[in-house]
Each structure stands twice: as structure tokens, then as C-alpha cells.
């Protein structure tokens, strides 16, 4: 049942209404670098985001913030000169494709010409369980929701009892 529980938690991570936290994190952007891996063991070493959402921004050494717009695959593909350098990038593209390492990629455009700090807001995968006895802390209401939905999920594997006709 542990695998069923973790599978359910994994699928819940894709639903905004079930994601109880949008986490803001910051990462160092290096001058002249526009591509960064993100995920456990990546350049941005954090739990791999399920989704990155607005608002995102960069902060310079003077603590001035500049917004960054999220763009999709199509918009990123239309950028002809991806290595153009300016002080502040204007766009962020999150490539969620899975590599063999399980990492995703963040592209910032234009490539910054100075070191900056990137702030992103992301959905994180709901915690999985290492064992049935694993204790996790959840917001109010989640324990019952998990118990109920796991029962519903597991019930499909059992045959229903047919009442006998007298």
C-alpha cells in the first residue's frame, strides 16, 4: 500500500488545489550563464519544482529588483539570439523535460552580464512516505483527505459483495 500512497501523493502534486504551499526560493545567477539545471543535485540544488509560477524576479548587488516574465516553449523557441547579454534578464523558461538525471532546466534570457540573485515561486511535490510509519506534518484537513482518497484508490482492487437473492 505504500507504493499506492506515494503514487497518489505524486499525482496530487500536479493539482493546484491540492498543493498547499507555493515556495519562494532564491538562487545565484552567474554572469554570462543563461542555463541552469534544477532539482536534487542540479546547479539549483532543491526539490524539483512541479511548476514555476509568477511573480519571479532578479535582485542585483544594490538590492534592486527587476521582474522576469515566465514564457512557454513556443515563445522561447522564437528567440533567435539566446546568448545576448544584458544586465537583467527579462524572461524565464522552465523546461520540465526529464533527463536521465531527473533534472529540469531553467533558461534566463537575455543572459545576464552581471551576477544576480534569481527568486522563483514554485509548487513543490507533496512529500512521499519512506515507510508506513513515516510521520509528516500537514495542514489541517490533509490527513483525512489522504486517508479517504487512499481508501477510494485501493477499493478498486476489491470485488464488491453481491447480496444473495432469497
Give the ranges of each region predicted by the language model.
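Glycine-enriched, solvent-exposed interface loops adjoining structured elements
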Residues: 1-166
Amino acid at each position: 500500500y505504500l507504493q499506492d500512497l506515494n503514487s497518489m501523493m505524486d499525482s496530487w502534486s500536479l493539482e493546484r488545489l491540492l498543493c498547499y504551499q507555493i515556495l519562494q526560493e532564491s538562487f545565484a545567477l552567474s554572469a554570462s550563464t543563461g542555463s541552469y539545471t534544477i532539482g536534487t543535485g542540479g546547479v539549483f540544488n532543491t526539490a524539483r519544482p512541479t511548476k514555476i509560477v509568477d511573480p519571479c524576479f532578479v535582485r542585483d548587488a544594490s538590492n534592486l529588483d527587476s521582474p522576469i516574465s515566465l514564457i512557454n516553449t513556443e515563445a522561447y523557441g522564437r528567440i533567435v539570439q539566446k546568448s545576448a547579454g544584458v544586465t537583467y534578464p527579462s524572461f524565464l523558461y522552465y523546461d520540465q523535460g526529464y533527463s536521465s538525471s531527473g533534472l529540469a532546466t531553467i533558461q534566463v534570457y537575455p543572459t545576464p552580464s552581471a551576477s544576480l540573485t534569481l527568486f522563483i515561486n514554485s509548487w513543490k511535490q507533496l512529500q512521499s512516505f519512506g515507510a508506513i510509519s513515516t510521520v509528516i506534518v500537514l495542514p489541517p484537513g490533509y490527513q483525512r483527505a489522504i486517508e479517504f482518497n487512499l481508501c477510494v484508490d485501493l477499493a478498486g482492487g476489491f470485488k464488491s459483495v453481491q447480496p444473495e437473492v432469497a
